[in-house]
Amino acid sequence: MKIAILSRDGTLYSCKRLREAAIQRGHLVEILDPLSCYMNINPAASSIYYKGRKLPHFDAVIPRIGTAITFYGTAALRQFEMLGSYPLNESVAIARARDKLRSMQLLARQGIDLPVTGIAHSPDDTSDLIDMVGGAPLVVKLVEGTQGIGVVLAETRQAAESVIDAFRGLNAHILVQEYIKEAQGCDIRCLVVGDEVVAAIERRAKEGYFRSNLHRGGAASVASITPQEREIAIKAARTMALDVAGVDILRANRGPLVMEVNASPGLEGIEKTTGIDIAGKMIRWIERHATTEYCLKTGG
């Protein structure tokens, strides 16, 4: 097969591993910067160009689209989809997952347990919002945040009000969420491919911090997950219509809670921690699903 990887930086670990895994299985691979793609949207002859040349047909596309370029990155991916390329994750699913508020609403509708979460637009509702999630300590999150950026633990009610007011002063959209104290700064990252959790790690926050993201200095170890955690991770990925997802779970006294579903999970931390060839599993998923029937169905 001919596979395109959409990424702004082909030197990143995840891109290199996906490229290596695809080549090892006999596929042709090209890494394309989505911001250098431009499109002819034409009902008679739609096409996509890259740095002055018209791109050939790709059997499959692996999107590694960062949050900062979600709008144009998903537009480029959508063009590949229109031309019959199989997307490892569909553009509509990526856009949906990037909206934290919408994601939580969809997950809640499917009965997936979450931390109690509130959102309000008016400053007049701040006090009620804090009470809604059980008071302080609580977590304030930017809706557009990623990798632990824009996440603040407010340990007192006064601190919570100050943080919420400060974010509102920046015209930022925020979520207010209960703090799961018993998680003790740890979460579980489950890597889902299709209908299987292929790997899981426990991420522990750096001493003195509460965010466990590896990009923020957290440490990782292999996690043994329960059948309930496995089931909830797969259900969360399926709810978001993602074939590949990083599902972050908090272990609360009342059971596992889904904190976030990531549409473009990094591979470095979880592969190096577990020793599992996740990139290879992703390529094998593509091989099973990037079929002639898919191309015919989508017009390729």
UniProtKB/Swiss-Prot annotation:
InterPro entries: ATP-grasp (IPR011761), ATP-grasp_RimK-type (IPR013651), ATP_grasp_subdomain_1 (IPR013815), RimK (IPR023533), Rimk_N (IPR041107), Rp_bS6_RimK/Lys_biosynth_LsyX (IPR004666). One of its GO terms (biological process) is protein modification process. Mn(2+) 1 binds at residues 248, 260. Mn(2+) 2 binds at residues 260, 262. GO terms for molecular function: ATP binding; metal ion binding; ribosomal S6-glutamic acid ligase activity. Its EC number is 6.3.2.-. Binds 2 magnesium or manganese ions per subunit. Keywords: ATP-binding, Ligase, Magnesium, Manganese, Metal-binding, Nucleotide-binding, Protein biosynthesis. Residues 104-287 form the ATP-grasp domain. Mg(2+) 2 binds at residues 260, 262. The keyword Protein biosynthesis applies. Mg(2+) 1 binds at residues 248, 260. An L-glutamate ligase that catalyzes the ATP-dependent post-translational addition of glutamate residues to the C-terminus of ribosomal protein bS6 (RpsF). Is also able to catalyze the synthesis of poly-alpha-glutamate in vitro, via ATP hydrolysis from unprotected glutamate as substrate. The number of glutamate residues added to either RpsF or to poly-alpha-glutamate changes with pH. This is Ribosomal protein bS6--L-glutamate ligase.
